[in-house]
Amino acid sequence: AYLPNPGRLWELLLPGRLLYLVKNPPGSGKSIPYTALAVEREGRPILLHTHLANDVAASLLAAGRLPGFEQDRVIRREAAAGSSRYDFLLARGGRDFFLEVKSCTLFDGRIAMFPDAVTQRGRKHLEQLAVHARQGTPGGVVFLVHSPQADTFMPDFHTDFTFSRTLLDVKDDLLVKAVGVEWGEDLSLGPRIRNLDIPWGLIEREARDEGGYLLVLEMARSRRVDVGGLGGIAFRKGYYVYAGSARTALTKRVERHLRRRKRFHWHIDFLRDAADSCTALPVRASEDLEHDLAESLGKLAEWSIPRFGASDCRCATHLFGFNTNPTRDPEFIELLLRFRIRRLEAFL
């Protein structure tokens, strides 16, 4: 099935999840027979089709039901301005107003976040909307959150730090709104349309280039690796998750870990060189989460490598083994959501 959504969707597209598909009609030009519209999570469908999210916004605007835009009128969709194109050109208080709509499917508990994958296009939209606003044509962005329980929205500074800092930089130039919607089993739009809170102070505190991180490494075959002071270690075939932290320059630390060519310093450098692939999952935070991450991973892992990455702390290890890819494991995804999103509820 064709999936018109550029996100990672790790927490949604897990094995066994129910997908809502529509058959592509003859002559549609699509070589794939189906298009994915939604996926079920916790008994409710979550809209995946990003183009349909714009149709939802258009319908709410026409009915005067989009919070913050009740009196506005759509002049046209896909409005061009210079080198940019925006989802809507509105008539707002007698003036033109550019509006971008972003579809948000990442949430846990009360908090929703966007984006779930790096979006250079989204960052560019924010920057150019702010330029137009400073030149006299106001604009804004609406994050359409497909969650029935979320009451708070934050940019996903774990996944796209640059987008998140850009949103903070332009928030005083633009109208920034987050709106919650929900869907029925027949994919009809539910009656509740909610204005979500955006806690700018908390975002400013947490969206910093510091915190913890997880590295997911694949070993396609068993092999013995010389790990510095630990000596030779037999790594069995499978996946390994390493928990680390950086009090400053987290982005550069993660980029260094992802590179193969470097001067080896930490235990993880030796394993990264031997691994077939490596995926980084930052967990930006104003508090030290490294040891809590390691403890939680230890409860999920199928084995561990003693003393790995733990020479300067009381933890038994910071490296944990899994037979299958943990990013496809609902329990690992729940752990990631808990540290990235749900723990922030305590600060609301």
What residue spans do the PLM features occupy?
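GIY-YIG nuclease catalytic motif and its immediate N-terminal context
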Residues: 195-262, 281-288, 327-348
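OB-fold/S1-family single-stranded nucleic acid-binding modules
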Residues: 28-46, 190-192
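Beta-strand/loop nucleic-acid-binding surfaces
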Residues: 1-10
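Flexible glycine-rich surface loops and low-complexity tracts that mediate binding to linear polymers
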Residues: 15-27, 181
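Aromatic/basic micro-patches that form nucleic-acid/chromatin recognition or nuclease catalytic surfaces
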Residues: 173-176, 205, 248-333
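Non-catalytic C-terminal interaction segments of nucleic acid-processing enzymes
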Residues: 138-140, 144-146, 151-209, 214
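Conserved catalytic cores of phosphodiester-cleaving nucleases, focusing on short active-site segments
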Residues: 86-116, 129
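Acidic-basic catalytic patches of nuclease active cores, encompassing PD-(D/E)XK
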Residues: 10, 42-75
